[in-house]
Amino acid sequence: MKNLLLMTLLVLSSFSISAKQILLGPNSNSQEEIQEALIDLEPGDVLTLEPGEYFFEDGISLDVDDVIFEGSGIDDTILHFGDQVSGAQGLLVTSDGVTLRDFAVLDAKGDAIKVIGADGISMIRLRTEWTGGPKETNGAYGFYPVESKDVLIDGCVAIGASDAGIYVGQSQNIIVKNSIAQYNVAGIEIENSYYADVFDNLASHNTGGILVFDLPDLPQQGGHHVRVFRNKAINNDTDNFAPEGNIVGEVPRGTGIIIQANSDVEVFDNDIYGNGTVNLSIVTYGYETDDENYNPHPKSIQIHNNRFGDGGFDPDVGTGELAAILFELSGGDMPDIFWDGILPMNQILFGQPDDEKLVISNNGDATFLTLNPIKYLLPFFDPVERDIKEYEGQVRPLPEVILN
């Protein structure tokens, strides 16, 4: 036992002795110095940037496991990419166990911070921003971890992305918390991902506040087990400025939360108001696809104990189809919660399994609208249903996400 303890202490001691802390300040050669330092890091090292402004003409990248890359504060260490001429990202991370914290990435040519294939990535107190306001020439994503596991985004700020400010795609075990997303097309988006907790965030002045999407033709699909709670999805009022062809280009201005084609999603204890088209929508993926493995229908969605306020007062009927269809169906009396009512044909005929049914419970005076698909297909019937009480049911809380 003593020998084992001694060996452990020796290993820890050698690790701490070999780990380095590198401190760099701004100068005319910052691009080369920082990239060289990122290449030369070894596991356990910490690279710290002093307060100041750092200017880049190329993207920078990190491919070393178990390191920390940090600045001296979200408003104090500023990485400027406004003159970037090469690289699809400001910062690209392709390694495991990395922590990024306490700096800002401004005006990247493409995505601000992209992480690919990481087993453990922590982004803490970071800011990504395009400083010229909402424009389709802005980069697509602020925070962009994809194909990763154990993703933490905590205390971050995302402003001005032409797709999503905070986006996590094709990943699993995800926490997005204590963050602010403003003036993006999508504020926060969880796409084709498994086990995500999104909580204590502010999503405001975006086109759409919080999106939980699942799309076809991707290696990982069938998004499931997403909890959205204690957020403020409020006052999302920015015109859609996504480049033509982007899926989020269909999101109407004034959308609080959209759930599309996911299963096992729990939305609770949120403040949702000030969204001019609709506060919350649950919709089927509406495009044809040749992907035989893809299920376009949302199921096992639970909406409970939220606080809804004014919504639907300025529907964006000119963007996509959602707002125009909803406006027509509702006669202009837009609901707080909308479900398109579309089900697989066998469920239209024989009913949904109980554990897949939509549950809406304890949302105050929230209003509701859905379609009866059979009545919608037949003439002389009103397909619109508004009785929210029919969807009261037993809430089955989803498990908390715990990162490894």
Question: Which residues are covered by each model-predicted region?
Answer:
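Sec-dependent signal peptide recognition
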Residues: 2-8
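Hydrophobic h-region of N-terminal signal peptides that target proteins for export
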Residues: 9-18
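Right-handed parallel beta-helix/beta-spiral solenoid domain characteristic of secreted/periplasmic
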Residues: 20-32, 46, 66-109, 132
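Extracellular beta-strand/beta-solenoid scaffold signature
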Residues: 31-34, 57, 81-91, 107-114, ...
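Short, T/G/N/S-enriched strand-turn elements that build extracellular solenoid repeat scaffolds
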Residues: 32-40, 55-64, 69, 114-117, ...
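Right-handed parallel beta-helix
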Residues: 70-75, 96-107, 119-132, 149-162, ...
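Acidic, glycine- and Ser/Thr-rich low-complexity intrinsically disordered tracts
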Residues: 288, 293-404
